[in-house]
Amino acid sequence: SLICFAGLSACSTENAVVSSLKTYDVSNSPCKRETTMADLQRQPREEENKQTKLSIELGKDGVAQCKVEDVKDNCAIRERVVNVTCEGNQITLVVHHKEHFEVLADCICMYNVDFKMSKLSQGNYHLKVYYAGSVVKYDKEQLVYDGEIRLVSGKVTQVTLRSGVPLPVD
């Protein structure tokens, strides 16, 4: 008789296949700081230039606790989600609006987006992070991070995203 073994592959540095890496338990903070567009153009406050950071803490179970801190977005848009793909050792995250908005507010807010990502192995990865609107189209203009990271179980890896870039509105 023929016996087949099928395995689920996690995104790892030893695996060159597309995996079933996924994000889940996405939550958005309330608006942390609000600035009107007029105020921002007249006199940008130092806090509005605060760098957006992505933190990834890899658990022993392969689940990563992630946070994008201080994402700039329109005040009318309350929910952002995160998509992930992984091929070989490249992880691509896309932070985007959950739904399309017809009416936008004349202000921007800073939000945090928390999510979990699984299953990951310890190791070195090439990470790309994009921002997108609700249509989820993105290119190099929306690339806010492109670099190498090392994930170690039980440790937080933090990267700084390109500053001053709000999520696009489509």
Locate each region found by the language model:
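Sec-dependent N-terminal signal peptides
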Residues: 1-6
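C-terminal motif of bacterial Sec signal peptides marking the signal peptidase cleavage site
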Residues: 8-10
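Exposed, flexible binding/inhibitory loops of compact, secreted disulfide-stabilized domains
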Residues: 12-170
